[in-house]
UniProtKB/Swiss-Prot annotation:
The keyword Glycoprotein applies. Binds to sialic acid-containing receptors on the cell surface, bringing about the attachment of the virus particle to the cell. Plays a major role in the determination of host range restriction and virulence. Class I viral fusion protein. Responsible for penetration of the virus into the cell cytoplasm by mediating the fusion of the membrane of the endocytosed virus particle with the endosomal membrane. Low pH in endosomes induce an irreversible conformational change in HA2, releasing the fusion hydrophobic peptide. Several trimers are required to form a competent fusion pore. The gene is HA. This is Hemagglutinin. It comes from Influenza B virus (strain B/Finland/151/1990). The lineage of its organism: Viruses, Riboviria, Orthornavirae, Negarnaviricota, Polyploviricotina. It is a single-pass type I membrane protein. It comes from the Viruses.
């Protein structure tokens, strides 16, 4: 007779790493990881996802919308998640802006981080009667409005001295910027200043010297001195060539808090303000958004969660996402592999 000891077994290609025994062969495993492939970005399942700030504002960049360029004002949909599709927002097509002087490019990204965003229906300041006035409100042929007349950004008023009596140099003037949002939101107040060559500065403001500007709100104070001249003629988005430039900035005012702006000639006084509340998770991505996905991943786009873990590129992700691991994980669902039993000697 032949007597065999052991258990029934077959060759096992499955190896798992254990905490106590190192690598162990087992009879069966369940893979716990997947390696995603790149896909388009999508709407996040179970929540509203925002792509462009104003989807119905045609031919408008997010910076156009944030500054209130004529023809670029509309409703910004509420969203719990937002796609940062302009990593470095492109210029606004209304008037040449000196982007390197300020944080104006960050404004669309700041707004994107809020769940609810709306533009006020009223102006925060009566610009015509502001200190140093009376002023007429300047417009530009580079900013055509809905009737194709000259216009300017809805968030700012270009304060040009109204007559020769006040078209003179001035010491620093200060205007208080009240809080006008009605639901306790953060108030994002946009302001700026215009500068040009010496001839245009004298023509518009009666002073060709560099002008000083300061804003202060929520414990943050910012100072500027304008640059006079040295600008080549520049046209934005097919508009009229401009010898001047504008510098745009913003300040965030918390509920009930007043801000201040100290200025000389060339001020762009704040007008309509953004009222923003809630938080929206922001992730770098691309448009358009196609379909739905469990997870949005900066490197892979929209992912549907098929496994609890993933390998590959590690990057920011939002939603119901698998967890990144360096190496594949397996769950043993069989027994420890034993080699085929050896025959005992015949008796």
């Amino acid at each position: 007779d032949r007597i065999c000891t052991g258990i029934t077994s077959s060759n096992s290609p499955h190896v798992v790493k254990t905490a106590t025994q190192g690598e162990v062969n087992v009879t069966g495993v369940i893979p716990l990881t997947t390696t995603p492939t790149k896909s388009h970005f999508a709407n996040l399942k179970g929540t509203k996802t925002r792509g462009k700030l104003c989807p119905k504002c045609l031919n408008c960049t997010d910076l156009d919308v944030a500054l209130g360029r004529p023809k670029c004002t509309g409703t910004i949909p509420s969203a719990k998640a937002s796609i940062l599709h302009e990593v470095k927002p492109v210029t606004s097509g209304c008037f040449p802006i000196m982007h390197d002087r300020t944080k104006x490019r960050q404004l669309p990204n700041l707004l994107r981080g809020y769940e609810h965003i709306r533009l006020s229906t009223h102006n925060v300041i009566n610009a015509e009667k502001a200190p140093g006035g009376p002023y007429k409100i300047g417009t530009s042929g580079s900013c055509p409005n809905v009737t194709n007349g000259n216009g300017f950004f809805a968030t700012m008023a270009w304060a040009v001295p109204k007559n020769d009596n006040n078209k003179t140099a001035t010491n620093s003037l200060t205007v208080e910027v009240p809080y006008i949002c009605t639901e306790g939101e953060d108030q994002i107040t946009v302001w700026g200043f215009h500068s040009d060559n010496e001839i245009q500065m004298v023509k518009l403001y009666g002073d060709s010297k560099p002008q000083k500007f300061t804003s202060s709100a929520n414990g943050v104070t910012t100072h500027y001195v304008s640059q006079i001249g040295g600008f080549p003629n520049q046209a934005e988005d097919g508009g009229l060539p401009q010898s001047g430039r504008i510098v745009v900035d913003y300040m965030v005012q918390k509920s009930g808090k007043t801000g201040t702006i100290t200025y000389q000639r060339g001020i762009l006084l704040p007008q309509k303000v953004w009222c923003a509340s809630g938080r929206s998770k922001v992730i770098k991505g691309s448009l358009p958004l196609i379909g739905e996905a469990d997870c949005l991943h900066e490197k892979y786009g929209g992912l549907n969660k098929s496994k609890p873990y993933y390998t590959g590129e590690h990057a920011k992700a939002i939603g119901n996402c698998p967890i990144w691991v360096k190496t594949p994980l397996k769950l043993a669902n069989g027994t420890k592999y034993r080699p085929p039993a050896k025959l005992l000697k015949e008796r």
